Regions:
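A short hydrophobic beta-strand segment most commonly corresponding to one strand
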Residues: 59, 86, 100-119
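Conserved short histidine dyad/triad with adjacent acidic residue
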Residues: 23, 39-54, 89
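Asparagine-centered strand-capping/turn motif at beta-strand->loop junctions
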Residues: 96-98
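Short acidic-glycine-tyrosine-enriched beta hairpin
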Residues: 73-90
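Short, conserved beta-strand element in jelly-roll/cupin
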Residues: 42-44, 53-70, 108-111
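A short, N-terminal "cap"/entry segment at the start of jelly-roll beta-barrel domains
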Residues: 1-36, 115-133
Length: 133
């Protein structure tokens, strides 16, 4: 059993690298253990991931704010605090904050994450299935 206490000092979040558009702050909640990585990620308005996929899938639990998620070939969906999202193994997808809202979620990634290209601005700003942007 492993117990990890949250960071106790300001500035312990990592600055997102080349897998994100906009300002994104990932907090490593649990280092990689048996192929499972758990992060809490804070996205500023408009911040979002690049296209990516997970070897054994990914679970997102939205803690605060409003965001967007899209699987390749599917509609953009609005996500809100309390929502849980399951991306099946190998499904190409992206997720992040709405253009006008912050978003915080916990991401539970199973297996290797394969990062791909940036989401085109026109795709990110497309109308969602709910009629929102």
């Amino acid at each position: 059993m492993i117990i990890v206490a949250p960071p106790q000092q300001a500035g312990t979040a990592g600055k997102a690298g080349s897998q994100f558009t906009g300002e994104v702050h990932p907090y490593l909640t649990l280092p990689s253990t048996d192929g499972v990585v758990i992060n809490t990620v804070c996205f500023t308005p408009g911040g979002h991931t690049f296209w990516h996929r997970h070897e054994h899938g990914q679970i997102l639990q939205v803690l605060a704010g409003r965001g967007l998620v899209q699987a390749e070939g599917g509609p953009i969906r609005v996500i809100r605090a309390g929502d849980t999202i399951w991306a099946p193994p190998g499904e190409r997808h992206w997720h992040g904050a709405a253009p006008d809202s912050y978003l915080t979620h916990t991401a539970i990634s199973l297996g290797v994450t394969a990062w791909e290209e940036e989401v085109a601005d026109g795709d990110y700003l497309a109308t969602t299935v709910d009629g929102e942007v």
